């Protein structure tokens, strides 16, 4: 019997919306798991990303951005998901953006001060800071806010110093058996990942009109005789005008979304994919907690 020690633990990636948490997770894993977009609030579920390297297994929880605005049911549930992720982990990576500091950052920090887990502060997008002279005083200001385990300036986009974060994570994993086989990179189903890929393309190809008012339901996900997958995706929007926007002129927009989503699915599933998309108006879904539960928004709380 092998007596080699193994190390395993859960790490929450937290921060206000749009600071680069999902990009950081994807870089730490070496491939795309969490959806990234320039819009705030693109991550709606806690995605578990798993990175195994030799005896070390880091299980990353990618939270929705914690934010102060809680009026809509979907926002309340997203904040609940983010807060519950902080409570049950060995380590927290708190992501902030360059030299910006907002009331939302302050709110996340206050939640972390109440927690027991040590916190790494990842100062992201430092390569985008115009006035480099402002960076050091800002890092000193951040250091005075809390007793951080470490403060690491990074660029999740380029990968700068992401290996430093990974190294700190490894050092703080407790001795434990691995929770997942070493080839696992997420505990989410292929059906769930298909819906996330479609949603990312919607975010990417549509204007700022649709930050929350769109979601994706996978109605059919089956293997076919060609060794690939037949996938039917239903895109839910809140208003008729949004439906027209998703479809585009003579169906051009939804065609582009479908083509790009299919490419990503084929790469992720390593098999041919036949994808069909429909758009349906379901008014008020983002305000209706029952509808959100039926769409799986609270399946992991």
Curated annotation (Swiss-Prot):
InterPro entries: G_ERA_dom, GTP-bd, GTPase_Era-like, KH_dom-like_a/b, KH_dom_type_2, KH_sf_prok-type, P-loop_NTPase, Small_GTP-bd. Keywords: Cell inner membrane, Cell membrane, Cytoplasm, GTP-binding, Membrane, Nucleotide-binding, Ribosome biogenesis, RNA-binding, rRNA-binding. It holds the Pfam family MMR_HSR1. Residues 7-175 form the Era-type G domain. Disulfide bonds: none annotated. Residues 154-156 are annotated as: G5. Residues 62-65 are annotated as: G3. Residues 124-127 are annotated as: G4. One of its GO terms (biological process) is ribosomal small subunit assembly. An essential GTPase that binds both GDP and GTP, with rapid nucleotide exchange. Plays a role in 16S rRNA processing and 30S ribosomal subunit biogenesis and possibly also in cell cycle regulation and energy metabolism. This is GTPase Era.
